[in-house]
């Protein structure tokens, strides 16, 4: 989702990005 495109968000929610 859009969170994956944001490095900080992806770090906070690692399970959201494959």
Curated annotation (Swiss-Prot):
Cystine pairings recorded for this chain: 3-9, 4-17
Molecular function terms from GO: toxin activity
Keywords: Disulfide bond, Secreted, Toxin
Tissue: Expressed by the venom duct.
Cellular localization per UniProt: Secreted
Domain of life: Eukaryota
One GO cellular component term: extracellular region
Keyword Membrane: no
Free-text comment on this protein's domains from its UniProt entry: The cysteine framework is I (CC-C-C). Alpha4/7 pattern.
Protein name: Conotoxin pc1b
